């Protein structure tokens, strides 16, 4: 995750801003600079290579002292920065909202996946600039629309019905922030269309998740899609979701956290996110992840939780 201000800077033209991508030499200069504390939140002028991000975002970049940041000296960084600028330049951003726009925290891996989709001749985003723009605006939080199947970050499709598409996510070969853990496995479920869904199609998804992905928890980050993650990674997701939610509240970003369908979401996660929306502390919310919940009535007839061991999936073991 990183703020949009890590990729580009605003240049005032008439009454609105044009956004320009950073080059990696300017960022490199900023990372070596000694900056007064009062100037940490200001864009840095590298003198030689142009404008660089505010020094307060130093930890967002991979350096000898910080391996957890993004690899900004890659071609992919430039491609992602240009993708963001193209999207922002399609909007009218004024002095009143430029700060809020640039403080928006976005998913670096999601944006890299959009670049990968854009460069794939078999993908619809390769052929449609309008759809690519729409997908990018959603990814950077500048659209009220949710991420649906056609505007999704992409991946390998492992399940699809009339209402949902399930993607296997892999970041092993990413350039900006690869996940090199060979055991990493995660999925995302997007809605094919943002409209009411038939119980029949919900039941099909629930059955698929229950029998094929029983080692995973179904959660949401509040953005209109489901994530299927290992139970061992749930606490980490909770920390990230809570931090992003609080950051958005603090900066005044419109943050309509979508709890999604309670019949699909893991019961403990639904309790966690509901508590978070009520304004409780992280500790109070996270306790709900580890509490034994009272089993809910099965909303779907004929979908039993009783299953023989040889019928239970080994995915994620």
UniProtKB/Swiss-Prot annotation:
Region: RNA-binding, residue numbers: 205-241
Highest taxon, organism lineage: Viruses
GO biological process: viral genome replication
UniProt effect for mutating residue 221 to A: Almost complete loss of NTPase activity
Mutagenesis or variant effect for residue 110 to A: 35% loss of NTPase activity
One Pfam family matching this protein: Rota_NS35_N
Enzyme class: hydrolase
Lineage: Viruses, Riboviria, Orthornavirae, Duplornaviricota, Resentoviricetes
Function statement: Participates in replication and packaging of the viral genome. Plays a crucial role, together with NSP5, in the formation of virus factories (viroplasms), which are large inclusions in the host cytoplasm where replication intermediates are assembled and viral RNA replication takes place. Displays ssRNA binding, NTPase, RNA triphosphatase (RTPase) and ATP-independent helix-unwinding activities. The unwinding activity may prepare and organize plus-strand RNAs for packaging and replication by removing interfering secondary structures.
UniProt keywords, alphabetically: ATP-binding, Host cytoplasm, Host-virus interaction, Hydrolase, Magnesium, Metal-binding, Nucleotide-binding, RNA-binding
E.C. number: 3.6.4.-
Effect of residue 225 to A: Almost complete loss of NTPase activity. Unable to induce NSP5 phosphorylation
GO CC annotations, alphabetized: host cell cytoplasm
Record keyword Hydrolase present: yes
Major subcellular location class: host cell
GO molecular function (one): ribonucleoside triphosphate phosphatase activity
Sequence similarity: Belongs to the rotavirus NSP2 family.
Catalytic site positions: 225 (for ntpase and rtpase activities)
Compartments where found: Host cytoplasm
Natural source organism: Rotavirus A (isolate RVA/Monkey/South Africa/SA11-H96/1958/G3P5B[2])
Residues annotated to bind ATP: 107-109, 188, 221-223, 227
Consequence when changing residue 188 to A: Almost complete loss of NTPase activity. Unable to induce NSP5 phosphorylation
Signal sequence interval, chain numbering: none
Known partners and oligomeric status: Homooctamer. Interacts with VP1; this interaction is weak. Interacts with NSP5; this interaction leads to up-regulation of NSP5 phosphorylation and formation of viral factories. Interacts with host DCP1A, DCP1B, DDX6, EDC4 and EIF2S1/eIF2-alpha; these interactions are probably part of the sequestration of some host SGs and PBs proteins in viral factories.
Protein name (database record): Non-structural protein 2
Cofactor field: Mg(2+)
């Amino acid at each position: 995750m990183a703020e949009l201000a890590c990729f580009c800077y605003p240049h005032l033209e008439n009454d609105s801003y044009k956004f320009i991508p950073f080059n990696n030499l300017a960022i490199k200069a900023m990372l070596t600079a000694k900056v007064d504390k009062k100037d940490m939140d200001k864009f840095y002028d590298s003198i030689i290579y142009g404008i660089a991000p505010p020094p307060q975002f130093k930890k967002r970049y991979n350096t000898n002292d910080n391996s957890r940041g993004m690899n900004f000296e890659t071609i992919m960084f430039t491609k992602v920065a240009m993708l963001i600028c193209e999207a922002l330049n399609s909007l009218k951003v004024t002095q009143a909202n430029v700060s809020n726009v640039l403080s928006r925290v976005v998913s670096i891996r999601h944006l890299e996946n959009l670049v990968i989709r854009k460069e794939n001749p078999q993908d619809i985003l390769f052929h449609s600039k309008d759809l690519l723009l729409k997908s990018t605006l959603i990814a950077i939080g500048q659209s009220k629309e949710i991420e649906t199947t056609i505007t999704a970050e992409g991946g390998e499709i492992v399940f699809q019905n009339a209402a949902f598409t399930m993607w296997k996510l892999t970041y092993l070969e990413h350039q900006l922030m690869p996940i090199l853990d060979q055991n990493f496995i995660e999925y995302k479920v997007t809605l094919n269309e943002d409209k009411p869904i038939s119980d029949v199609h919900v039941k099909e998804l629930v059955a698929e998740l229950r029998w094929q992905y029983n080692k995973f928890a179904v959660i949401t980050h509040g953005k209109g899609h489901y994530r299927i993650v290992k139970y061992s990674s749930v606490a980490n997701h909770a920390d990230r979701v809570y931090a992003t939610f609080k950051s958005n509240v603090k900066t005044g970003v419109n943050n309509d956290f979508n709890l999604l369908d309670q019949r699909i979401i893991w019961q403990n996660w639904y309790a966690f996110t509901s508590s978070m929306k009520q304004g409780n502390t992280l500790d109070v919310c996270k306790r709900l992840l580890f509490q034994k919940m009272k089993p809910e009535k099965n909303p779907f007839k004929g979908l039993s939780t009783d299953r023989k061991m040889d019928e239970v999936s080994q995915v994620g073991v």
